[in-house]
Amino acid sequence: MMSTYKRATLDEEDLVDSLSEGEVYPNGLQVNFRNFRSSQRCWATRTQVEKRLIVLVALLAAGLVACLTALGIQYRTRTPPVCLSEACVSVTSSILNSMNPTVDPCQDFFSYACGGWIKANPVPDGHSRWGAFSNLWEHNQAIIKHLLENSTASVSEAERKAQVYYRACMNETRIEELRAKPLMELIEKLGGWNITGPWAKDNFQDTLQVVTAHYRTSPFFSVYVSADSKNSNRNVIHVDQSGLGLPSRDYYLNKTENEKVLNGYLNYMVQLGKLLGGGDENAIRAQMQQILDFETALANITIPQEKRRDEELIYHKVTAAELQTLAPAINWLPFLNTIFYPVEINESEPIVVYDKEYLEQVSTLINTTDKCLLNNYMIWNLVRKTSSFLDQRFQDADEKFMEVMYGTKKTCLPRWKFCVSDTENNLGFGLGPMFVKATFAEDSKNIASEIILEIKKAFEESLSTLKWMDEDTRKSAKEKADAIYNMIGYPNFIMDPKELDKVFNDYTAVPDLYFENAMRFFNFSWRVTAEQLRKAPNRDQWSMTPPMVNAYYSPTKNEIVFPAGILPAPFYTRSSPKALNFGGIGVVVGHELTHAFDDQGREYDKDGNLRPWWKNSSVEAFKQQTECMVEQYSNYSVNGEPVNGRHTLGENIADNGGLKAAYRAYQNWVKKNGAEETLPTLGLTNNQLFFLGFAQVWCSVRTPESSHEGLITDPHSPSRFRVIGSLSNSKEFSEHFQCPPGSPMNPRHKCEVW
């Protein structure tokens, strides 16, 4: 239908172009006029009949011309034909059900686009938030469940290990039989815990090494291997701040506002201490309060995330010897050689540290804290991470705390959902081939690649029109955009059984021993991390597994990654109008692409190296442009609590830039392919549909507790403001919805970076 409509339009234009001399009306009718003066005849010589006929003919002619003109204008400006296919009717129904058309789109587009969806979708039991991402993840979970529970002879060893892990998790009978025994034995093996029994008093360094490497906890600080930001072809050890049990330092420091959470956290700590064999509850509570006070001391020296956005300022490369001087409470060479064994670490080993002041202060804190408390704190980190692998009593304790922390209503979620999530989280690449074969069409990579190419072209077109950027920086920015590498669906190695098995060769899953399997995985994953230290970074090493409903940009690799899990509806559907696909996956692509040029990504060059490649004039101009967004988003609030416009700046830049690039790409597509059919009954143009599709991707609901947590931890703005903030900055949105200047969705002062 679309191509037929396009050909019809061209045919009509060809007809007009082929006409001969004379005035041409929009319908192609030619009317020739002879010279009036040379052919006129005196009115007085006409008979009455002639005069009456002439007047009548003149009136008829005038009426005919008026009718033809009106018909011509209507014909010329008619809307595209309506799509009445089953797919179009279905997507129209979904859109209508999500909308609240009684809301003025120029007043509150989020409520206009999502009001119906929000009314029909209260936060489900067992969840603290719900939206399009959640719905798609539930769909993916059901697929993974089926795949894990139905063995086939063709699966690889890695896939079989994922199935064994999942089935051990599902064996609740065995888990209930073991109760707390697996963790209690582990604590005893580590030298004990004063909360539940005697402990080894001179074991600080050994305990720290074991809980860091074998069990992937991060008390005091985190240690990991990643590409060196200033030499992206080389991996290097990183040391950074860490160690809080709650999601943000704000929970500890704003005690009045977060009193309910702090009390709930302490009660949770006490409950776990009791379940693990602690005796007197008052004694347990007293020691757990000391741990909480120690975490509060850590929170006091922890740097807020909004002050860590400029990596040029916080990046410091030191040697192991210099690190020893910086933070002497840890014997760094023995520590590093133990956790990275068999890799040898000497005093000249380069180490990247962020927030040198934090490491200095945490070293002082360790040296001035009682050894019993330090051990209690380290073991608490282990308990907090591993208790979910134990029996139902621990699950109940988790749920009770989650209700306080996130407002999650207590519910008996099916066990399989927990087990699918944990298996995917730990062995997602192992089960990846099953998921890809079941869900990912062969041509999906090509389709996604075409969309990325169109978005990238549109972004570069916008780049060429920026007035605040100098020409040299613009040229380098275009080179960086051209160099961005696309990773779609899955890393190639997972589809080769031999390569996949090689990756998981050193991991063994044991039937019916869930806790043991989880502990083995933590140890295995650290060994994989340690092995990367002397290897070059690898593009095939993804930070997200194939089923994940998400996407990301890697600055050191200068690549954008789109797992298979995010490519279905509502982000992309083959049968949907292009307006919806560009508003869905198109904006997602544009968002990740723009991250290469947000306040953090812009500091990396086309090769993924952190260096000052912008001219100072453009750096200053960029900062001025971004301050507008900081102020804009800081004026938004949820339940009276403001959005942190500084902390969310990078994501806000990406949201705005992604929307702009996707809209421009859609316009380019229409110019090339012709107008699409419209959807029935909506009364919307396809340009309006593009913006509506974008907004409905972000329809979501959250509990008040979850909203509070998001405001102080999430670098993304709340969904409502991801929609309102981006659209109110879009001139094209205001034009298509005819929003009056000065209305909420069309403010006179708009922010724009890219």
Curated annotation (Swiss-Prot):
Ranges annotated as spanning the membrane: 53-73
Swiss-Prot/TrEMBL cofactor(s): Zn(2+)
GO MF annotation, one: metal ion binding
Positions of post-translational Phosphothreonine modification: T9
Co-factor: note: Binds 1 zinc ion per subunit.
Keyword Hydrolase: yes
Regulation acting on activity, per entry: Inhibited by phosphoramidon.
Major site of localization recorded for this protein: membrane
Residues where Zn(2+) binds: H591, H595, E651
EC number in record: 3.4.24.71
Cystine bridges: C83-C88, C106-C739, C114-C699, C169-C419, C628-C751
Domain Peptidase M13: start-end pairs: 82-754
Alphabetical keyword list: Cell membrane, Disulfide bond, Glycoprotein, Hydrolase, Membrane, Metal-binding, Metalloprotease, Phosphoprotein, Protease, Signal-anchor, Transmembrane, Transmembrane helix, Zinc
Similarity comment text for this entry: Belongs to the peptidase M13 family.
Biological function: Converts big endothelin-1 to endothelin-1.
Protein name, as recorded: Endothelin-converting enzyme 1
